[in-house]
């Protein structure tokens, strides 16, 4: 089964809205139970790390339960990174469907997120690479690789920033 460009675009816009509106449960439902979420780090040679199991990553969750735990901490104020509460605006551009076959869609897109906290606006930007399972009624994210392109991060970065 293939999915249209417009359907993928709307799916990604919905994910961005869920993050901006703090609709955590709806956001989690967009991920398959075995979905990976990975933000590799830049190494000393200015190259992205390639293996989340053996090299440093900015974020690594091997399945959705890691994301669920993160959301639990955010919602129950057990996350100093989210106190005081932040406000975000996610913006998506340059969406490309790279490959489609047998209910799988691979895509990439650029993003820019503005984050307001402590009377300051921070800008985060990068490129995401996603794999979607398109076999069901609605797509599910089975893998997301977030390439953060900022050289300097003034404070912590979290799943809702990207």
UniProtKB/Swiss-Prot annotation:
The species this protein belongs to is Pseudomonas putida (Arthrobacter siderocapsulatus)
Family label: Belongs to the bacterial ring-hydroxylating dioxygenase beta subunit family.
Q: What is this protein called?
A: Toluate 1,2-dioxygenase subunit beta
CDD domains recorded: ring_hydroxylating_dioxygenases_beta
Q: How does it assemble?
A: This dioxygenase system consists of three proteins: the two subunits of the hydroxylase component (XylX and XylY), and an electron transfer component (XylZ).
Tell me one GO biological process term.
Answer: toluene catabolic process
Is Oxidoreductase one of the keywords UniProt gives this record? yes
Q: Which UniProt keywords apply?
A: Aromatic hydrocarbons catabolism, Dioxygenase, NAD, Oxidoreductase, Plasmid
Pathway where it operates:
Xenobiotic degradation; toluene degradation
**InterPro entries given for it?**
Benzo_1-2-diOase_ssu, NTF2-like_dom_sf, Rng_hydr_dOase-bsu
